[in-house]
Design a protein with these regions (language model features):
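Peripheral/terminal regions associated with large enzymatic or DNA-binding modules
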Residues: 1-96, 100-245
């Protein structure tokens, strides 16, 4: 299976620096194509410098750094680069962001899910986040009816047949009034998933922690804690438990 990691980056090098440190420690990174999509900003030079240092440190030979010629924004930036990666022939793509810390086994998790659930079209996405308790079992996976945008992955057939065509690219989807539960992530979670009976697979113990207290649409009040997150997780033999609603 041809797998890729998409990291979208904007103007927060103070978040990006520890996030790249975390990704540098991730096992199996060398097996994934990496695309870093950088939005233009006043600190784009500093951001690209951090990415270049990450590439030198990891020695990863399959990394492309794409500086968007114009700012695409939070709707278009992930869409454009996800679509490009699938069009280039990748079978499974994980999307990460510049303010999301990850565990060192996160790609082992995604590699397992990508293979195990490839033939289950109702599993639309794979997630790294969980709000589970601190003592959650790192090996356990569960199905969920909700979509979570904090480091997630999907397959090419799900993208081309469903997620791409239904992506909210202009805030035209909403619940009740414009601006309420709108955007691509809300659209997937509150409309696309329930209307089509779709779900996701996620770990009980989170493999991601959001450190982005300040962002395009983020405030400290928006952060959901991840008490089960650990930076270092031994290699697991993953297993699925019952469905979580």
């Amino acid at each position: 299976m041809n797998r890729a990691l998409l990291l979208t980056v904007f103007d927060r090098p103070h978040y990006l620096d520890p996030v790249l440190d975390a990704w540098a420690a991730v096992r199996g990174l060398a097996d994934w194509h990496v695309r870093v999509a950088v939005e233009p900003s006043d600190v784009a030079g500093e951001v690209v410098g951090l990415v270049d240092a990450f590439v030198r440190r990891t020695g990863h030979r399959d990394v492309e750094v794409v500086l968007n010629p114009t700012r695409l924004g939070v709707l278009e930036n992930p869409y454009v680069h996800l679509d490009a990666l699938f069009a280039a022939g990748h079978d499974f793509v994980v999307r990460a962001e510049d303010d999301l810390l990850v565990s060192d086994d996160v790609l082992e998790l995604f590699a397992h899910v990508a293979t195990t659930y490839a033939a289950e079209p109702t599993v639309a996405t794979a997630h790294a986040f969980s709000a589970g308790p601190a003592d959650a079992d790192h090996a356990e996976l569960a199905r969920t009816d909700a979509f979570c945008p904090w480091v997630w992955g999907t397959w090419r057939d799900r993208w081309t047949g469903l997620l791409g065509p239904t992506w909210d690219r202009d805030y035209s989807t909403f619940n009740g009034s414009p601006g309420f539960e709108t955007g691509w992530d809300w659209n997937l979670n509150t409309r696309v998933f329930p209307s089509r009976g779709l779900g996701a697979v996620a770990p009980l113990a989170s493999r991601v922690r959001n450190i982005g207290e300040v962002g395009e649409h983020g405030t400290p009040d928006d952060l959901v804690p991840a008490p089960s997150f650990a930076a270092h997780v031994p290699t697991q033999v993953f297993r699925e438990r019952g469905r979580v609603h």
